[in-house]
Every structure is written in C-alpha cells, then in structure tokens.
C-alpha cells in the first residue's frame, strides 16, 4: 500500500469532517512509515481522548497495519482556537 502524508490528510479530513488536519512524515528518510497527525474536528466534542483516538484509528484501519509509528493529537475546534492563542 502506497501511503503519503497528503493521502492520510485527505482521508482524515473527509472521513472525520475535520476543519484542520496536519500530517507529518516523521520517518528519517521519509519512507512514509511513521507519521505524526493533528486532527481538529467537531466530532470530538464531548469525547474523552481514548474515544477520539479510536475514531482516528477506525478511519485509518486499512492504513495502520502498514504504518510503523503513529502519533496523534486530537482537538475540538474550541481547543484548537485556544491553543493557537497561546
């Protein structure tokens, strides 16, 4: 499976109706097997961190077996706005 930061970004944005998504390929040689993501979505409202991460994991269920390392940060739009003001 051919993975890229752009592919993951588009899928997360579409499936989670995210207002903001950042995906960084953190592999040393950029071989697309290690990623760090930030997802901002209203779908995370009222959900604890574990449920948010499960939503992201479910969205990327087909891709995760091909990824060696995956770090995620999940925020609601309000949390994202407060974080950007810091």
UniProtKB/Swiss-Prot annotation:
Residues found modified as N-acetylmethionine: 1
InterPro entries linked: BOL2 (IPR045115), BolA (IPR002634), BolA-like_sf (IPR036065)
UniProt keyword list: Acetylation, Cytoplasm, Nucleus
Subunit structure: Interacts with GLRX3; forms a heterotrimeric complex composed by two BOLA2 molecules and one GLRX3 molecule; linked by [2Fe-2S] clusters.
Family indicated by similarity: Belongs to the BolA/IbaG family.
Function per UniProt: Acts as a cytosolic iron-sulfur (Fe-S) cluster assembly factor that facilitates [2Fe-2S] cluster insertion into a subset of cytosolic proteins. Acts together with the monothiol glutaredoxin GLRX3.
Protein name, per record: BolA-like protein 2
Underlying gene: BOLA2
């Amino acid at each position: 499976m051919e993975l890229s930061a752009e592919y993951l970004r588009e899928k997360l944005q579409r499936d989670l109706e995210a207002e903001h998504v950042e995906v960084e390929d953190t592999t040393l040689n950029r071989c697309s097997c290690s990623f760090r993501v930030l997802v901002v979505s209203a779908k995370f409202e009222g959900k604890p961190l574990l449920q948010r991460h499960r939503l992201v994991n479910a969205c990327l269920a087909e891709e995760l077996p091909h990824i060696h390392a995956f770090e995620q940060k999940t925020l609601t739009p309000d949390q994202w706005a407060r974080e950007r003001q810091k």
